[in-house]
Amino acid sequence: MPESMIRFGPGGIPLSCKGRTQRDGIEDVHTLGLNAMEIQFVRVNLFERYVADEEIGQGPLQVANEFVVDVLRGRKPVSVFEPELKFEKGDILKTLNCGIGRDCSDFTEIGEIAADLDVSLSLHAPYYMDLLGTEEIAVRSTDNLRYAGLVARHLGAQMVVTHLGFYHENPKEQALEKVIQKLKEVREWYDRMKIGARIGLEASGKQVIFGSIDELLTVCKRVGGLVPVLSFPHMHARDGGVLKRKEDFREVFDKVRECLKLGTLYSHFSGVEHEGGNELRFTPIKKGDMRFEPLAEFLADENPEITIISDSPLLEHDAMYMKVILERVQLKNEAKVSREEVKVGAPIKPPLKPIAPPKKKGKAGTLPAPKKAGKPPVKKAAGRALPKTPAKASGGKAPKKAAPRKPAAPKAKNIPKKAAPKPKLPSKPKPVSRPPSKQKPSPGSRPVAKKKVQAAPKPKPKKK
């Protein structure tokens, strides 16, 4: 099976990233071993101003610290991507502040960093999109898709992900036709502006929002440049928790392949809490009832070209968790294939050492008795050579020498064992004689009478 790329990444700047800019986020994604990132284009702030005198004669890409998304000349929009477009006096500039970058140079630099680090970029349009609402809300939603496309062009992003909105009072068939018409206009505008990013339609997780998998496939089939975004937690919640086995995920992929011929797929994954066919909230993968292991088993078998974005509250942590699970399943499959090859087609290797021939059997199928070990040779004592004994006259043979007997070891006498010595008791300390201390009598005390020592009697002199 040919090798393909399965990419993992977070939906936004990683939580563990110390910096909060898109540059920091992309570098942190690469450091974590991930290779995809979905930039959140969720804040759209538009400002209008007249062109300054020093800007007359310049183009939209030459404006510093501002991103010009539209030029109104006589209250009519002018394409901002025309190479010969120059500002004139009285023009009104529409500038965008989105939190991703300040101007075109910032977007281009971010895209170059991602390309150097092999991090695939995508862009998520504002979450509140309602193509089936009132005319004002629908126009604002399509404008947000256009602005997202302009940013994606400078970033080099490959996908603009969007929701589609509520059904409202529209029947499902009528809602389908309206969505197709509006998305067709946006896609044609993308083509005129030479925006290569595809528009990804995300599956919805609630019954009141347009976006079942069948509706998305119908829209993508009728409008070119649109692809479905396989949001597995949304599909799992909308259908009542059906994605539990590897075969369940296989059915989803087979349905997409039958309808569309797509080389690369795009998806979201996380845990989800749901009730009555409606999504309640996203959860970490381990806390939801939809496990990643069945999807990993399918991916390891089919090896499709797909990007999986973590929508979990843990973002990059669950993205790394999914990558580890997939690698484990792949290693397990490789080990299984190698074992089967050994059983079926691998030749038996010869033994390293030759096998000894079997021993010959004796009579009646019994093995021969082992030979008795001979006596060890007697070493001759160093010194003079022993005299040769004369041979007998009768036979002419020398008499056999008797083998010298080894002296028998003396028998051990029954020596009574000595009793263990009794432990010595510690001797009493001898009193230490101290000289009498010469102390002065205290006043008022009685003097102590000293004992008289009798002197020894002198010897009497001898008489002469």
Name these PLM-found stretches.
Residues 115-116, 126-230:
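Active-site acidic/histidine proton-transfer and metal-coordination neighborhood
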Residues 1-125, 131, 136-142, 146, ...:
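N-terminal pre-domain/capping segments
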Residues 14-16, 173, 210-213, 229, ...:
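Gly/Pro-rich active-site loop or hairpin
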Residues 29, 124, 152, 199, ...:
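Conserved, mostly hydrophobic/aromatic
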